[in-house]
Amino acid sequence: MTLGNPTKSWHSKSTLTRVGIVLLILFAVPFAFTQKHAAAAQTIAPAAQVIQNLVLVGTSTIQATPLGSGVAQVPEIAADSFGDSSVKGAGVAQAPASPTSIRGHNLPIPSKEAARHSLAANAAVTANAAFPPPEPVVSSDSVVSFQSSGFRGFNGISHVDSRTANNGNQFSIEPPDQGLCAGNGYVMEAVNDAVRVFDTQGNPLTGVQDINSFFHFPAAIVRGTPNQFGPSLSDPKCYFDPQVRRWFVSELMVDSGTNAGATGRSFNLLAVSQTDHPTGAFTIFMYDVTDDGQNGTPNHAGCPCFGDQPLLGTDNFGVFQSTNEYGATSFNGAQIYAISKTQIAAAAASASAPLPVVVHIDASLQLLPFGGLSYSIQPATSPTGGGGVSEPESGVEYFLSALQFIDTFDNRIAVWAVTNTRSLSRNSPSLRLSFAVISSETYGQPNPAVQKAGEFPLGTSLSDTEEFLNTNDDRMNQVVFAGGVLYGGVNSLLKVGGAEQQGIAWFGVKPSFDDRLEGRVVRQGYVAVAGANVFFPSIGVNNTGNGVIAFSMSGTEYFPSAAYVEMVNGNSRPFVHIAAAGQDPEDGFSGYKQFAGATDGIARWGDYSAAVADGERIWFASEYIPKACPSVSSTTTPPCRTVNANWGTSVSAVHP
């Protein structure tokens, strides 16, 4: 369903230069919200820019490796990089007990956890309060049995594929974290912790390669006496840029565990193809995000830190990433990184080309007058490879972020811009960071999602009940800039059909510049299904606003499935199509209390889906639960699970 809404906004603009660490002061102009107010003429604490070095790691290709058996081994689940703990109770699913814990990535935003805990307390007073706004009451979309025009779909990488890659020198991991990119006749998928390339018919063009090997690092683990550990990689993203015709794959790397040669530092990784073919060579780069004042990083409070869930976007001139920065006991908000797109593409293709610099912008404090530290500032990608150029701004990359901090619901989002991105190719880049807070439809902290009852052998063996699915929070998901509009969506608690369900709030924001950044919600709406839950949206549209919102769906009548709604002229249609119907309940280790670090009864899911236009089709992928895993080397279809997990991914395409 689609809604319209004029918006009000609050603005700020800052100029960043290259000289050392440049402090910038942002001034809040008067603005009266219909909810929480920002005091007039505030001075926000200084933010900073630092110029960092990009480091060449090596070259790599996506290639087949021998497969392991997938039999549970010790250790089976990666020890948390931020503190080990022991298995409780039954141990690792029929394997001997060993020190294990759930991997620490895609961490919760502290203020959102407070909101989750206060949900019940706030519910009674919300209806009569001006802010937070009340829970949205929305109509239900219809689940239909037919597909959109030109639909095609196939199974992507599964847990079995990931666990057995590289001769089984992998851990069991939940959730997959969906990376997907398409272009030039290819489709690439990257998940935790494997990567593969397909043609547009779904035929595999490469084997499944483990992510560590692809990024030119030692295997996650080689079990033996003693065990040999590699660095921990997670949170994949990928993008084919039609402007420079190169493939970009990003990952977070934490190198502070027990691996041999560990540096005790954290990095963002970028793999850039040397040609427009993802089956060919990639060049691997990295830069430090530890932010402890060492190795050219700024000195942030509570660090050494790591940059959780690196997000990926581009405009005409730059490649942009943003992270949520965490220390051992601290949350430092959002950090933005910018690199010259043409220079990194040239450096990938030629060893003699100079390496570009990395411009690091601390964007954590800008939203303090509105409730808290900024988080998950999603950079936009574009069907054309450029975020748009406005000559006075000399290049601009746009971002969106959510604003729900400490209350259950909110009706504001933020639009951001980094301008003068043309300067990224110069010796002294000079960027300007701007943002505007605008009013929007209401959204708020989701609850875990129920799934259809079925067989769950792992949980049954542990005498546990069937799991719920973790919908995480209402941070902004993937953003695309198409036809002059920024599209993005969030998970949200909604009231539909008289009951609370987990749904999706989506936004279409038109940004503009007239001395300052302006933003206006020109389209928005909800995706909701009575008696079911939809979550982890990604919007893929072309420049006419035609495409899909992709997501996962579950409910008392639905096993976890991959689903979508169509977008037509920038508006969502009220029909939910099931791209791949789930065949069993989620039955993975991450929701069973016997595994250290697990959330009792709530399994990790997502943490995000992906959708992208390739010029002809809209490609999208989401997590779901398949019954069997078709084998490339055999005519049999074995069960799509190991002892510890059973997730799969579905890759689909439609003609917009």
Predicted regions and their residues:
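Short amphipathic alpha-helical "recognition" segments used for binding
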Residues: 12, 17, 39-40, 139
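C-terminal region of N-terminal signal peptides and the immediate post-cleavage residues
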Residues: 31-43
